[in-house]
Each structure stands twice: as C-alpha cells, then as structure tokens.
Amino acid sequence: MKTLIRPFIYIMSALMVLSFTSCNDFLDKEPEGKVPEEKVDYTNISNMYQPVSGVYAKIRTSGLHWVIWEITTIRDQDVFSGQWNGSDYYNLSEYKYNDSFWGFNELWMQYYNIIKTANAAIESLDLYAENITNDSDMKNYKAYRGEVMFMRAYAYYRLVQAFGPVTILRDNNQVDLSRSTANAVNKYALEDLQYGIDNMPRIRPNQSEHKGAVTAFSAEMLAAKFHLNMGNYAKVEELTNDIIEHGNFSLYPDFYQLWKIPGKLCDESMFECQMTDFGNGSGDLIDGDQWFVCQGPNNSGSDISGWGDCGILKSFRDWAYARGETIRATTSFLLADSTTPDGDYIRAQVDPKKTDCWNGKAYTPLNQLTPGRTKYGTNNNARIFRYADVLLMNAEAKIKNGKNGDAPFNEVRRRAKMPELTNVTFQQVIDERRMELMCEWGERYNDLVRTGLAKTELKGWSEDKALLPLPFNQYTQIPDLLKEPKDE
C-alpha cells in the first residue's frame, strides 16, 4: 500500500493547490494535474498506471470535500445539519435552497474537477497505448481505462442526483457547456460503465493488483444504481445477480468493525476511498481532509472530537429502536453522554441548539489510531459502495419483477441479528435500506425521491424541490446553462 501511494503524494499536493486557484474551475479548459505531454515518456509502459492513480487521488481531494458530504446527507429524512440555527446547511433539511450558497457551487466544481482529471487521464492512457507492443500491456491499458471511466461515471452519477440535467464534458477543450437531460447523462455514463464491465477484471477490489482499485463488479454495481434511479428493474436484477453469483463478495461479519480499521477493503467493499498514515505517528498523511472531522462529535478535550455536524435525529433513533435494532443502532448512533464499545467517552451535549447524536459509521476508536495521530478518523477509509447495497437492490428488483426477494434481504438482516422475514414486501426493503444505509451518501433521500415516497415522508418537500438549484456562480458566468437541456 505504501509503495503504491507514496509516489503520488507530492503530485497530488500540487493538484490540491491548483484546485483552489480559480473562482470557477468549471470554466478552466486545461485539466488539473495534466502533465505537459513533452515531459512524459509515453514509451515507458511501466508508468501507465500513474494517470489512473491521479484520478483516485482527485476522488479523495474533490469527492470527499466536507461540504459535498453535508449537502448530500442533510436532505435525508433522518439527518440534519447538527445545529438548529437557520443556516444554509440547516435549511437543506427543510428543502429551502439558496442558489448563491457557496456549497452548491463547490459541489458542482469538485465533481467536474474529477471529470476533467478523468478526461485528461484517458488522453494520457491513449498516448501510452500507441506504444504498446504486446497483448498483456494492451489488456492492462483497457482495464486501467475502465477504472478511469468508472470514476468519471461516478462523478456524473452524483451530479445528476444533485442537479438533474448537467453538462456532459466529453473533453476538456469543449466550448459548448449547455446541459443535457438526466437521461442523456445517464446513458453517457452507462456507456463508460459498460466499457469497464467488459474490460476490467471480474474480481473483488481487494483482489486487484493495485489493492482497492475498482473492478468489473464495481462497475456493475454503479450501473445497477443508475438503472435503479431510472426504474429499470430488469436490468438491476440482471446486474446484481451477476455480482451475487460470480463476485465472491460477502458481508463483513462484524457490522461495528466494518466501519473501523479492521473493515478497510474487506470482502464487502465495492468502492472505497483509501487513506493512510503509513503506520507512522507523524509525517506523511493521506486523508480526506475534513471528511471525517466534520462528522465528529462536539467532544472538546478528547481526540474523539470533530465539528459536530450531521446530527442523527431522535425520531429516526426511536424508529430504529422500535424495530428492535441493536447491532446497527450501537454502531450507527454515536450518542452524547455515552461510552462507546471501545471505551471512548462522548461528553454530554450542553447546547440544546445542537445535536446529541452523530454518525457512528465515521467514528474510529482511539485504540485503533496509530500512536501519535490525533486527527479524527485518521488512517480510516471512506466507504462509498458496499455489497449490502447490492443485496438490497437485488431484493427490491426481484420483488418489483414479481419474484421473491427473501434470500438477499435476509442475508443483510442476519448480520444485524434481526429476525428473518418471509414474502418480503417492497416497503420492507425500503425500510431495511433506511436502517442499513443510514447516513451513507444520501441513500435515504434518493430512495424516497426515486420511489415517489418523498411527497408523503418528507415534511416541506415538493416535486420542485427534488433537485438543487443551479449554482448562481455557474449560470451567471455560463448563460448556456440556462438553455433547455438537450437530449444528447
């Protein structure tokens, strides 16, 4: 792991500086991190993975921006900003949007930073391919290209979830920045994913040559999530069946440790963003900046402390306890004035305007931190996609297709020590997703919107509030964004 990441520390430090040098990165035509072509020896095929590593790093520095995480999760039925204070963050949970809110612009820019970096990486890979002379290297080239296309599709997936119609940036010198419909963007991203499905190895990410790299099964999962949002249940069933039958994935047996250091890159992992402190108490550190910290509890005087954002509402906790949840509740609810299973005490919340419960999935115990490290969540990975979601998508698709979804559904419940159910219904799957995927990348909000349940489940929500507004900074500088989206 150390040898894979270290060569890119200094490269990506420079990229992080570049990403903050413009008030509107979407307008910049030159992709961040693109090494001038005359300085790269594209005949040296041994360096061909470097552009791919750069895109993974961009996922970490851009895709894990703390404000993106908060915008993505706060609209969930069960999560709020953590403070009852009328801020732009709090208003998200009441579906009141301000198009001048800097966070919306940041979300837009950072996902396009990923897309531009992916576009540049594909250009570089294609230049390497011109010098390939054997089948083995050509196979690697196609697999590496598939990894980059997966990450580009991932950025579009998040953009469509947030804004609906967005710009398809086919290359970094594109002049036409008008938007395409959500269906057109989905189709474009699915083409990327199909390339990955066809050319990446059919193994788990933790079996990859570059451990943790996405695989054909990761691409199938993301494709299934696109199709789930589009209501294409036959395709969801087909894709998730293949993962279940041939992917050799399994649920990590300990739900609590799944989110801790022991659960990094386990057999449940479909896609996660990797961090490391290289086993050292000081010095080089690759992390998600404030991604973990923003979710940490108000716990001054302890290294188990963060900003206190992303509060878990009591109404959801009551719902979970009424269901009989124990394992998932203990793991997911990091409660004030309580001691965790690892012995870390979380102080009582003295401010009634702030939450008294935080996301336990982002908690790394003190006894798992490398001695000398004190930053909340250091050396842990950010989980993005996991096999439990595949099982629940499969169950939902089977039920919608008139079949029985009990087997995949109950596989998830068994780990949580919840009673198995028979003749599982669609609503039971949606409820199971609510508990299992709590505070994971806005899954609850997405589920309610895509199924039409939002209008009855979300107070203050209406169809016209399903999507975030176009950022003011974008449409004022790029008037073409206000044109009617095209279906291409």
Predicted features and spans:
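Conserved, well-structured interaction surfaces
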Residues: 45-63, 84-162, 175-184, 193-205, ...
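Long, intrinsically disordered, low-complexity segments
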Residues: 23-26, 83, 111-114, 188, ...
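Flexible, polar/acidic helix-loop-strand segments at domain edges
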Residues: 318-386
